[in-house]
Structures are given as structure tokens and as C-alpha cells.
């Protein structure tokens, strides 16, 4: 049967389908379990590379193994692609021909005229072995392929065709047309770059026998929580459109397009048009960015020598220099073979070494740049024994290349008072001898200092980050015990040591006059002092409630233990994550379970702790004389600090909802609320807004926002696909997150949920021999990701404590610039 041109119409494909399959012997008897191998004499086609002439042509193949009338969906698809070919700039237009005659795949001259082939087929065997061999030869010659919806059911016994389409539908996929939300995660591919981030549309959604994620590059996923996916559901990661470079050519598949109405949609036609631009060689695209085999994770540091921390201390943060060196710190825990001193009568109680190591990419060697004597080495044990103080954070001056200034956030051992069990926390500036990679400890300039209690562990925070204006952000923990509140709000005012509460975070995180439980923002000056930038939460000069009850350094209040923060210097947006309390389940009496939290912070704000968590879910108040008795629920819109340990304002700023929160039960837990806005906190009534993550043991570990540098010549930089995506992780590596998420700029500052998330666990590998215990991650100037693995112990370093690097090795976009088609003029 001859090919038809773009304006022709013919009916009755059933005659060809029946004849073709009888000729192939495929209608006689039951289906074979495997396809016969093609006759070698039928696989010697020679198709010019790349196929297609000066003017771009697209072949639509709509053959089907089923008998009957021509499908209206196929007709709609053909008409839509014809329309697409006539649209857009002249240089992006193309000619369309359609056929149901599979003999075109054995005609090398005719097949070689087409830049891309579109399969609008139904299921079943639609090609003979020789015809499939012709299609394979076409792809090997750098041809393009687009499969639409039921094309994934074609050639069911061919492993090669399975690879071409990427996945096979599950037999029990729902057949009903349902409206669902598609998460459009690739904002650069021509098939998706102009689509809504959250694309709501009806279709017949397919489930997959095997999830193709990691083997293909997924450009869009369907959100299963928005429709009924049935028993064969794929879960939170449900790819619906993807692409990859395959067998010498380019393959794009979409599971959408299963309805006639799909082809009437402007956005769906734009989706197909972008797929065709890439497969016809009219545009380049990166279809390698999320294929896990394109990444390499390598350990950069060796295990320490016995009894030494020559390679790494107890990992607690890292930063990269413009020349590629990686500076990373050890908090203060010693090698496990060394004794620790926990007796407060001993002047050396808790004494440890906060180490700064430097890994040099030129030599691939490690230098111990310096050691600070810190309070931070008491080993493990209960909360009145262990300690999380020490060397907590590191940053390099924005002009580090010229001045060699290094900023350290730490607790000096010289500043402890064993009698009162108080200590001094400080942020200091040191100068590095750049020739020797050694810190000049005598160069210290103390910028900022404040008191912390050290009678009880925990929650020191520690991360620091710069914005583009030279403002330094400093994350501090609530300096509070995890106990005495049954794992709910840390608001028990009773426990204290010599008058200082250590179980009431209203003294710290909820206190407008205390620097603990905050993210501070200051502007360091060259003389070692600092000024306060405009736009902090307070000026420090407020006269409310008598005055003298605020600190101007506070940018964010109400955070519990923000170990890691980052700032996207392109937007100066702050990203933070903090660890939550310990309650394993929600309580209708006391409030939410432990929520670990991530937030996009676009302005000074109160993030809630210890009054509210998540999306403004309140805790129950408690107070003297009997903190075991619940009082009223906190008002997240107008919180009050009525703790006897508060020396700040009573009336606090309203709480801003957070973007990501998770508990042992799941991600984004929420509950029905009563007329006062109080959730029921009944576990059986919980719903989960973020099904892609879950807690258990959990410790949020905020990461960077990746920014692609097109001018960089680095061969290891991550692709542009990741540009603008925010990396969120957890110390633990089971159900806990290790994901890249896409936020909507319109809603992210007000607690908007991520619109898209994808797992990084096969790229930043989990497991005992991988990066099991994530302790920090940042991109370097080379575009590679540098990661700290804490190791397998606690309060010490061990053989698994290490610095890692994750690089991209997949190559650039395809097709090569020299293979781009000219297009119709």
C-alpha cells in the first residue's frame, strides 16, 4: 500500500493488518513466547546517516494487529501531527506522511527520506522480523522515533522494541479516562519547557510493568494521588513521558494521547511538537540527565590512620573554594579509640578538636588546615552526657581568593563555665595561608558571640551561607533537650540547671530576644565587625512591650535544629531544613508527630517552633505549676510566648507555613480541622500531601539549589536539566528523602508544596558502601556535587566517614550541532 501524503485520507486498515499478519504467520495458533530472530539477509539495509533530506519529513505509522475500523484516536493523532508540521516558524515546519503499510521499513531508500518515525499503532505484532530489522537499521543511522500511548503495546515479544519505547504497560492499567495532574519536571526539553508545571488534563493513564526511571530520561510524571491508578499503580514516581538516545538514534515516548480529545489540546500538541523537534533533528535536547548510569560517585578521602583524624574528623559541613578545593570540618568527636571526659569536675570535660581539612583537586591529597580546641567531645549516652556543640559550620569569604578569610561557627572550650554549665558560641573570621593551606589561629576576629547552655544536649544547628549582597546567614539550634515533653513541643518550662531552662524552646527558638533557634543575618565588615542589613525580622530597636526585647540579627525565628542552610545567589532565596522532635505518632492531646522540615524562605519570618509545625499545625500549650497538664492550642496566626523563661516579646510574628514536612507515617501529613482550625491529629484520619517521602529515623539535611554554568568547560558538571532544582535529603537513607524538587516561584515563599520531585538515591548512592549517612552536600565550581558521609557511628569518625564527589559523564545534548536539520524554508 503506498504512503499517503499529509492531505490524503484513507480508511480500512484492517485489510492490510489481517493480510500482513497472516503472511507473517502470526494469526495461526497461540502467540509464541519469544520472537524469532530476523533472517540475517533481511538486516543488511544501508540507510544514510542521519536520515532525512534538506526538508524535514515525518512518517506516521499506524498499523495495528487488531482488525476493525480505523481508530478515531489514530485519526485525531494524524490530523494533529499534520497541523503541527504546518505550525511555528518556517524553519521548524515539516512534511507529514502516514501509512499503515509496514513494508516501508524494508525500503531503505524511502525510509531514509524521513527524519523521524511516529508510531500511532495499537498493540500486538505490527512488524515482521525483517520490518523490525529495518526500523532498527533506521535508528542506528541516527533516526528519530516518537511513540504515542498504545505504541508501548506494539511488538510485545521484542526486547529491542521494549528498549525503544522504554517500558511496557501493565495489563491491569485502568481503561477509564480520568483527569489527573502531570508534574512537568523538565523545564528545558522542547517537549515540556512551555507546559504548566502542574498540568491538569484527562487521559487513559497507563501503569508500567517495570518503572523505567533511571534507564530513561523522564520529562513528566503523572501524580497518582489525583486519579485512581488501580492495583498496578507505580507509586509516587510514575513516569508518563520520557526520552533517551537509543541505539544510535533518538527515542521519545509519551503515555498520553490515548483519547481523541487529547489532540484538541493546545498544550498536548505543544508536547508532541517539542518531541518532534528533537527527534527530527530540528532542535537539541538533553535526554541523558536523569539516567543513573551517566553519573559516577567516588570516594575522595581515605580512611584515617589508626588513632588519627588525618583525613577527616567527625563530619559536620563543607564548602568549596573558587579554585576547586573542598574545605570540610570535624565537629569535635575524637577517634573512637580515644577516651572522652564527661566529669564536670575535670577541667578538660568535653574537650575536643574541631578540625578543618582541605581536599585539593590538583593533588587529590588532604591537608589538615587547623584545629580549634572546642567543647564537643563527650561521646554518646543520654542527653545529660552527650553534646552536639563543637565546630559547627564553615564558610569562605566572598573574596576568599584575594583575602583568604575563613568563617567558623564554633563553641570554644575556653568559653565554658563548669559551674553554671554555660558556654559561649561564636562566629569568627580566620585567615588561611593559601600557599600552605594552614589556618592562622592567631588571626581570629570574633564577629558575633552569644550564650548557650551546655548542661544538656542538644540542637546546635551550625550551617552558614552567603547571599549575593555579602550578607552572612548563620543557623543556630534551639539549644534544648529532646526530652521532658514526650517528643512533642519542646515547651516544658520546669527542668532547669541553676535557673536556666534546658527543656523549654520558648526560651530560645520562640524568644525574640535570644539568638538560639534562629537563622541570623549579618553583614560582616572588613574590620571584623558586622552591620545589620535591612529586612531582618527585627531591628533590635522595637519599643513594643517596653522595648529591649528583640535582636536585630534575627532573620528567621522558630527553627529547632537547622543543621544545613543554603542561599541561591541568583535569587538570594534562603533554603533551610531542620530536625524535628521525637514523637512517633500524632496525638489528639498534644499535637503532631515529629516533623522534619524544609522551607523556602523569601522574607524574614517565624517558622513556628515550638508552637506550630508543618503547614501551621499547632501544638498544645503547657506551663507551670503542672507542665504535664495540657492547656490551650497555640494560635499559629497570633502566637504568644507566655513562658516564664521568656525575656522577649509575648506577642510574636505570625507563623509562615513550611513547604516540606514529614513524619514516620509519611510526607506532608495533614488532618481534618475543627471550627477553630485545630487538626484532629487522629492517625487514621491523616492524609499525605507528599507521598514521595517518609520518615522514621529522620534528620533533615538541606542541600543546594543547582545552577548550571553554560560557560564552564568542566567535563563533570551536572546537566542544565537540574538548574533551579533544590536538593533535599536526610541523614538516613531508607524511605527518607534524597531528592531534587522543583518549586513554583509563585507559591514557594508562602508554604507552597513542591510541584515535582525525583529521587537521587541511585545517583547519590545509598547503602553501606555508598553515601549512607548524608551530612552535607554542595556543588563545586566544576559543577560536580561534593558530599559528606558522616560514617556509621555517632560522636566520632569511623572508616566510612568520607568526602565523596558525584560527577556527570553522559555527554552533551543531542543531536550534535553538525547534525541539526535545516528545516523547510
Can you say where each PLM-predicted feature lies in the sequence?
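Secretory targeting and sorting signals
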Residues: 2-36
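Catalytic beta-strand/loop cores that center a nucleophilic Ser/Cys/Thr
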Residues: 39, 43, 167, 173-248
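Extracellular ligand-binding/catalytic regions of CAZymes and related secreted enzymes
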Residues: 37-53, 226-228, 232-240, 244-290
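Asp-box/WD-like beta-propeller blade repeats and closely related beta-sheet repeat scaffolds
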Residues: 421-465
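Helical hinge/lid and interdomain linker segments adjacent to catalytic or ligand-binding clefts
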Residues: 57-154
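Residue-level detector of Asp-centered blade-edge/turn motifs that repeat once per structural unit
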Residues: 320-323, 396-402, 466-469, 568-571, ...
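Beta-propeller domain segments
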Residues: 286-292, 334-354, 380-384, 389-391, ...
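A glycine-rich, often tryptophan-bearing local segment used as a flexible ligand/cofactor-contacting loop or short
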Residues: 119, 124-195
Amino acid at each position: 500500500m503506498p504512503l499517503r501524503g499529509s492531505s490524503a485520507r484513507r480508511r480500512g486498515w484492517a485489510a492490510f493488518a489481517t493480510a500482513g499478519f497472516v503472511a507473517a504467520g502470526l494469526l495461526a495458533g497461540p502467540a509464541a513466547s519469544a520472537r524469532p530472530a530476523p533472517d540475517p539477509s533481511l538486516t543488511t539495509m544501508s540507510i544514510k546517516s542521519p536520515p532525512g533530506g534538506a526538508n524535514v519529513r515525518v512518517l506516521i505509522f499506524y498499523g495495528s494487529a487488531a482488525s476493525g475500523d480505523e481508530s478515531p484516536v489514530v485519526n485525531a493523532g494524524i490530523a494533529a501531527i499534520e497541523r503541527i508540521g504546518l505550525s511555528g516558524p518556517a524553519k521548524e515546519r515539516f512534511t507529514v506522511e502516514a501509512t499503515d503499510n509496514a513494508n516501508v521499513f524494508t525500503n531503505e531508500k524511502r525510509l531514509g527520506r524521513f527524519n523521524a518515525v511516529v508510531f500511532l499503532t495499537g498493540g500486538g505484532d505490527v512488524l515482521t522480523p525483517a520490518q523490525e530489522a529495518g526500523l532498527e537499521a533506521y535508528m542506528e543511522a541516527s533516526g528519530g522515533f516518537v511513540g504515542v500511548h498504545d505504541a508501548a503495546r506494539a511488538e510485545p515479544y521484542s526486547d529491542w522494541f521494549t528498549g525503544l519505547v522504554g517500558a511496557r504497560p501493565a495489563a491491569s492499567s485502568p481503561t477509564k479516562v480520568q483527569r489527573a495532574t502531570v508534574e512537568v519536571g523538565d523545564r528545558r526539553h522542547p517537549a515540556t519547557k512551555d507546559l504548566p508545571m502542574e498540568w491538569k488534563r484527562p487521559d487513559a493513564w497507563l501503569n508500567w510493568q517495570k518503572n523505567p526511571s533511571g534507564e530513561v530520561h523522564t520529562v513528566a510524571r503523572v501524580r497518582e494521588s489525583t486519579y485512581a491508578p488501580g492495583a498496578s499503580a507505580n507509586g509516587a514516581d510514575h513516569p508518563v513521558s520520557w526520552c533517551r538516545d537509543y541505539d544510535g538514534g533518538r527515542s521519545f515516548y509519551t503515555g498520553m494521547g490515548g483519547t481523541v480529545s487529547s489532540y484538541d489540546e493546545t498544550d498536548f500538541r505543544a508536547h508532541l511538537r517539542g518531541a518532534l523537534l528533537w527527534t527530527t533533528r530540528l532542535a537539541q535536547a538533553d535526554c541523558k540527565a536523569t539516567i543513573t548510569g551517566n553519573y559516577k560517585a567516588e570516594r575522595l578521602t581515605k580512611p584515617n590512620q589508626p588513632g588519627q583524624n588525618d583525613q577527616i574528623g567527625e563530619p559536620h559541613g563543607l564548602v568549596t573554594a573558587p579554585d576547586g578545593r573542598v574545605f570540610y570540618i570535624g565537629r569535635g568527636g575524637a577517634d573512637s579509640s580515644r577516651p572522652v571526659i564527661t566529669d564536670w569536675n575535670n577541667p578538660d570535660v568535653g574537650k575536643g578538636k574541631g578540625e578543618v581539612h582541605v581536599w585539593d583537586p590538583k593533588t587529590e591529597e588532604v591537608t589538615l588546615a587547623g584545629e580549634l580546641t572546642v567543647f564537643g567531645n563527650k561521646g554518646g549516652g543520654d542527653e545529660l552526657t552527650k553534646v552536639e556543640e563543637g565546630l559547627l559550620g564553615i564558610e569562605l569569604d566572598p573574596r576568599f581568593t584575594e583575602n583568604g578569610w575563613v568563617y567558623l561557627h564554633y563553641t570554644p572550650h575556653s568559653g565554658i563555665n563548669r559551674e553554671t554549665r554555660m558556654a559561649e558560641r561564636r562566629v569568627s573570621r580566620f585567615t588561611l595561608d593559601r600557599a600552605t593551606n594552614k589556618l592562622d589561629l592567631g588571626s581570629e576576629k570574633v564577629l558575633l558571640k552569644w550564650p548557650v547552655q551546655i548542661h544538656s544536649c542538644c540542637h546546635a544547628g551550625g550551617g552558614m551561607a552567603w547571599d549575593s549582597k555579602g550578607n552572612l546567614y548563620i543557623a543556630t539550634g534551639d539549644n534544648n533537650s529532646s526530652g521532658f515533653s514526650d517528643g512533642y513541643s519542646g515547651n516544658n518550662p520546669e527542668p532547669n540547671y541553676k535557673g536556666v531552662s534546658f527543656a523549654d524552646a520558648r526560651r530560645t527558638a520562640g524568644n525574640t530576644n535570644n539568638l538560639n533557634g534562629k537563622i541570623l543575618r549579618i553583614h560582616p565588615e572588613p574590620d571584623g565587625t558586622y552591620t545589620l542589613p535591612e529586612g531582618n525580622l527585627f531591628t533590635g530597636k522595637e519599643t513594643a512591650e517596653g522595648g529591649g526585647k528583640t535582636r536585630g540579627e534575627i532573620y528567621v525565628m522558630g527553627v529547632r535544629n537547622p543543621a544545613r542552610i543554603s542561599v541561591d545567589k541568583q535569587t538570594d532565596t534562603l533554603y533551610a531544613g531542620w530536625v524535628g522532635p521525637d514523637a512517633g505518632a500524632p496525638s489528639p492531646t498534644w499535637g503532631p508527630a515529629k516533623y522534619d522540615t524544609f522551607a523556602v524562605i523569601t522574607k524574614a519570618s517565624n517558622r513556628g517552633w515550638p508552637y506550630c509545625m508543618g503547614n501551621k499545625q499547632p501544638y498544645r500549650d503547657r506551663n507551670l505549676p503542672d507542665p504535664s497538664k495540657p492547656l490551650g492550642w497555640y494560635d499559629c496566626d497570633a502566637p504568644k510566648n507566655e513562658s516564664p523563661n521568656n525575656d522577649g516579646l509575648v506577642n510574636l510574628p505570625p507563623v509562615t507555613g513550611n513547604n516540606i514536612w514529614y513524619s514516620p507515617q509519611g510526607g506532608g501529613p495533614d488532618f481534618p480541622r475543627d471550627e477553630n482550625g485545630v487538626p484532629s491529629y487522629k492517625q487514621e484520619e491523616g492524609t499525605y500531601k507528599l507521598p514521595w517521602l517518609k520518615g522514621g529515623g529522620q534528620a533533615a539535611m538541606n542541600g543546594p539549589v543547582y545552577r548550571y554554568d553554560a560557560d564552564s568547560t568542566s567535563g563533570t558538571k551536572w546537566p542544565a536539566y537540574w538548574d533551579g532544582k533544590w536538593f533535599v535529603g536526610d541523614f538516613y537513607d531508607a524511605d527518607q528523602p534524597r531528592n531534587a524538587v522543583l518549586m513554583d516561584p509563585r507559591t514557594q515563599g508562602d508554604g507552597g508544596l513542591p510541584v515535582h520531585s525525583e529521587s537521587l538515591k541511585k545517583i547519590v548512592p545509598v547503602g553501606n558502601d555508598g553515601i549512607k549517612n548524608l551530612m552535607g552536600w554542595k556543588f563545586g565550581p566544576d559543577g560536580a556535587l561534593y558530599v559528606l558521609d558522616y560514617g556509621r557511628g555517632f560522636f566520632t569518625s569511623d572508616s566510612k566517614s568520607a568526602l565523596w564527589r558525584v560527577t556527570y559523564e553522559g555527554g552533551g545534548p543531542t543531536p550534535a550541532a553538525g547534525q541539526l536539520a535545516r528545516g523547510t524554508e
